[in-house]
Structures are given as structure tokens and as C-alpha cells.
Amino acid sequence: MENTQDFSPPHMDASRPSLGFPLGTALLLIIIFSLSGIFSCCYHWDKHRSLRRSLANGRPSADIESNPYKPKPPFPEMKKPQNLSVPVLMPGDNTPKFIALPCPCAPPRPEKLTVDVQTPPQSPPVKPARFPVPLY
């Protein structure tokens, strides 16, 4: 009656990777962040290029986010002031019924406004009629 137990480690398959969960997760996060950094650099390539040019010239750029290739308006001094009011179409059944335009100034208001509230005279409360109720 011999009890022999096998305390040897279980057989490991050679094709199974030996990376643990924390190391695999760390590698996955490093790959994700590096790919997002590469895509971000490609997306903002014109800003990086203008920053490198300004640093090569020796003068730091005042506004990094401005686009150097954006065309300027041809005649900036001939800009007309924008009208801040817009007409509004009021809805109707099938077609607009009314066009609301902004008022150039506030309408004149009376200085003193009096409101007279009239209450009807109080009548005594009416008592309900009494009816005999049979108790069965």
C-alpha cells in the first residue's frame, strides 16, 4: 500500500505563449498609444511643419494653431458691418403666415400704467338641499 503522488509541474504546451497577463496588457497599451501618436502627427502635419520652420528661422511663432496657408481677404478695409438682425418666418399651416422683422427701437411706453381689478360682489353660500336617505 504505497501512496506515491506525482508532485512534478503539469506538462506545458510549447506552442502556448509564456507572456503573463500584466506584461501582455502593458505591451498592448504601448502599441495602442504609439499608433494613436503616429496618427495624430499625420493629422496635424501642417502645424508641425510650420512649427519646425519657425524654430529654424529663430523666431517662435505667436500662434501655433493658425494655418499659414489660409488666404487673407483681398480687401479687409472694405468690410461692411454685419447686420445683427434677421427676419424670422412664422409658421403657418402650409405656408408662412407672417414675417417678423426686428424693431429698430423700443416702442414708446406710457409712464404710468394703472390696472383696476374689479371683483364681483360676494353672495352668501348656498346650502345644499336636504334629501331623506333610507337606511336599509
From Swiss-Prot:
Membrane topology, from the record: Single-pass membrane protein
PANTHER family (UniProt xref): HYDROXYPROLINE-RICH GLYCOPROTEIN FAMILY PROTEIN (PTHR34291:SF1)
A GO cellular component entry from the record: membrane
UniProt entry keywords in alphabetical sequence: Membrane, Transmembrane, Transmembrane helix
Native organism: Arabidopsis thaliana
Main location: membrane
Claim: Transmembrane helix is one of the keywords in the record: yes
Location of the region described as Disordered in the Swiss-Prot/TrEMBL record: 54-87, 112-136
Ranges in coiled-coil conformation: none
Name of the protein: Uncharacterized protein At5g65660
Entry's localization field: Membrane
Segments passing through the bilayer: 19-39
